[in-house]
Amino acid sequence: MTKEPLQVYAAGSLREVFTEIAREHEARTGQKIALTFGASGLLRERIEKGEGAQVFASADTQHPQRLATAGAWAPPTVFVRNSLCALTQAGVNATPQNLLDTLLNPAVKLGTSTPKADPSGDYAWELFRKAETVRTGAYAALDAKALQLTGGPDSPKPPAGRGTYAWVMEQGQADVFLTYCTNAVASQKEVPRLKLVQVPAALQVGAAYGLTVKRGAPASAEVFAQALLAPPAQAALARYGFGQP
């Protein structure tokens, strides 16, 4: 009898590495995995409305914790980490040292993802709050100018086969985009002229990714969740630039 595919919902930033991990898991166990990717907050809303996810890998811990608090999902486990980087156009002369000046420059278009819908947007606003501790008035300026270009329910989708952030930057929608370092690395591979700038320590924001399994899901759900914490999957995540839990 053919096993039903395991329904795994995962943050968009996990697309490449989860596709690889799922393929390996299927080859090893025979368990088919159906992957659904998107902004974590939007996925959480879809799950709350009754979609059939059995494993949820979020780019934060708050969204899976909300599901757990409602009772139908297990408390989340942090399974991997990420951090914010600045993805910039070739002509932007940004360095870690002058990044805040660059972000505050009125002539620089600053792109982010959408807070609440996508944790990447929430992390950008956390960076803005840190900027306020470095320079008075920075939060208000950044909050006012930031363009929420991705991750929302109505955000334009890139053409098939294109990465969201590389496409947004190639279209010239932003001069600087605050996104996960893993996304920035992938975007640079797609559009080599783009530059990746590390965020200085005073502004750095870490992202803890939470993993949860639906209560009553088949045993294969817990098996896959445990596999994500095991050395082979952790090595794959590290290859894509993610940090250890």
Where is each model-derived feature located?
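Exported/periplasmic ABC-transporter solute-binding proteins
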Residues: M1-T36, S40-E51, S58-T61, Q65-T69, ...
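Periplasmic N-terminal soluble interaction domains immediately after the signal peptide in Gram-negative
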Residues: A74-P75
